[in-house]
């Protein structure tokens, strides 16, 4: 069969589902059609839940002691009307064996251990910039403020932050050890399963760049790693590494990717909103990482910037500082 209208909003079905509360558990599945070549719409049945979905989800939560909301979707859905639901499984659209995978997770033969690759928020909380009406003349006014970079930089609270995700157990992220050798940053951190079930955890390393002449978001994801399967009480040392030059920013005035002098704050955690400061890389001078050239001309618009960026004065007392000389870098010329 050929289905036309990818990304279309289907009409809401009309039905009356008797919810007596009988049985031990209830599962409610929210589905969406995915597509490409068009934006999501702030409408019920697409980005937003329909009245019927909200009604039935809240009814199931009220009448069943064990209730699971399953999201068989390819993108974000505004869950703000049903945030009181305690168990939400993001199944996504993972192919023809999705039913087998879901059954394994539901019956305890497998466990969820993923993390969100996008920020989930109310529709009105997303960055109100961009002109995407014409596919052959698109102005990406949002600049660097895409996804979590926007939410973290302007201080807006999402429903679920970038990198968030729970499983059937809990974890403790221990005290990290930071090492800096030349341009390489290495963070070793112990992760312990403190719950009663098997599981895996993902640890994420973010970096806040110095605020110099170039505009910067509050933080950027520099590295992440996932443990192997950990039994209750089991611990693993996770190693995260990245090269500082990967954080270089483009300077339009010189057509070069540069690292500005200053403090690069290392933040370790399990989501973009759950981090702690674990180290500072102090670059003692500006570094030109790559010399490029202007070949596409200058755009006819200015990138959007927040009026009041979410920047706080960090207390660096007790935080290890690693000085780095600019001479540690070898610039590259890209014609």
What would you call each of these model-derived segments?
Residues 1-335:
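C-terminal non-catalytic regions of proteins with extracellular/luminal or membrane-system context
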